[in-house]
């Protein structure tokens, strides 16, 4: 039914999950009799959901994206989407979301974060919680290191900006990832 829409996958929105979403959209629109050229135009103009592999900007040929991912499966989808990009090294600046989630999914977070070349973890975004779980971002960094991958804990956003600006190179991709205030870092990197 959706013949003639094969080139619609040449979109700006990366990731196999977005291909699945596009296919669902095509199927639903086709079922409702929407013309193929309208479906194609809509999909080609779709730039993605806010804070889902969202382009923040670039400087010195270094590109910064922001993603709301705050669960290991979402971070894995982001890592897989990154494979569709051409880059020298990947940077993830991750802010865990809630103490309870970080504690219960510590091993899963550590494993998925090893998909990135450079890993920076900042303080847990507490949201509505108090830390009654005996967990910190340092525990996550240590777990990542136990898997044989280097990771860096940096609390201050300004220190993260300085660290990344001193080390990122042309053709690198930087991702700020998490449901909290980590989204501020990408813009701060651009402003320095």
Language-model regions, residue ranges each:
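Single conserved hydrophobic/aromatic residue that forms the stacking wall/gate
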Residues: 1-9
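Nucleotide phosphate-binding/pyrophosphate-handling subdomain across enzymes
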Residues: 10-118
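Thr-Gly-centered strand-to-loop micro-motif
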Residues: 65-66, 128, 154, 177
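Short amphipathic alpha-helical segments
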Residues: 77, 104-106, 132-133, 165, ...
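Alpha-helix C-cap/termination motif
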Residues: 84-85, 147, 167, 192
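Short glycine-rich anion-binding loops that position phosphate/pyrophosphate groups of nucleotides
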Residues: 96-99, 124-127, 179-182
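C-terminal helical cap/extension that packs against the catalytic core
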Residues: 110-170
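A glycine-rich beta-strand to alpha-helix segment
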Residues: 159-190
């Amino acid at each position: 039914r959706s013949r003639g829409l094969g080139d619609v996958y040449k979109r700006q929105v990366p990731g196999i999950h977005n291909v699945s979403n596009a296919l669902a959209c095509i199927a639903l629109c086709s079922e409702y009799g929407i013309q193929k050229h309208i479906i194609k135009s809509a999909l080609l103009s779709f730039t993605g959901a806010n804070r889902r592999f969202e382009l923040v900007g670039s400087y010195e040929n270094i590109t910064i994206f922001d993603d709301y991912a705050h669960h290991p499966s979402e971070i894995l989808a982001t890592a897989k989407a990154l494979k569709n990009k051409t880059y020298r090294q990947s940077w993830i600046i991750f802010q865990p979301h809630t103490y309870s989630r970080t504690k219960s999914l510590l091993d899963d977070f550590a494993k998925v974060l090893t998909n990135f070349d450079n890993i920076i973890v900042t303080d847990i975004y507490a949201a509505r919680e108090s830390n009654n779980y005996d967990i910190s971002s340092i525990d996550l960094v240590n777990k990542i290191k136990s898997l044989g991958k280097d990771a860096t804990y940096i609390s201050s956003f300004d220190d993260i900006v300085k660290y990344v600006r001193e080390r990122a190179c042309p053709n690198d991709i930087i991702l700020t990832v998490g449901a909290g205030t980590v989204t501020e870092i990408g813009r701060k990197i651009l402003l320095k």
